[in-house]
Amino acid sequence: MKMQREHVVPLSTQVVALFKEVGELTGGGRFVFPSVRTKLRPMSENTLNAALRRMGYSNDDMTSHGFRSTASTLLNESGKWSVDAIERALAHGDADTVRAAYHRGAHWQERVLMAQWWSDYLDRLRVGGQVIPLDRAG
């Protein structure tokens, strides 16, 4: 985890099912997505980016970190979740050091609901739900 801080993530029912499926394929282990070189380390961001390039996406189209940006944008735009819960879900620190010293809430219950909502949202898109393009200019 970034900055070597523990980050606990609530899992939706869909993600739990996917992890079980992946575990059956990989034989389980410490990492859901281990490095291709050793099971003792996680898969690198470069490996994910290389996979995106092989799928035809340029760096301008998408990067692995871009998935986090997309999630942040869509979660914020939904109007359903507090900014604090979204930032905690993404393991972002607070730039305001005074606020960070006093605001240590995990927003756990909201993040549990948000994780399930996000998986349900992606499921709807996968089966043909309406996709609204975001204006890159603003």
Residue ranges: model-predicted function:
Residues Q4-V8:
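Short, mixed charged/polar active-site loops
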Residues M1-M3, T13-A17, E21-G29, P34-L40, ...:
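C-terminal secondary-structure termini that scaffold catalytic or DNA-interacting sites
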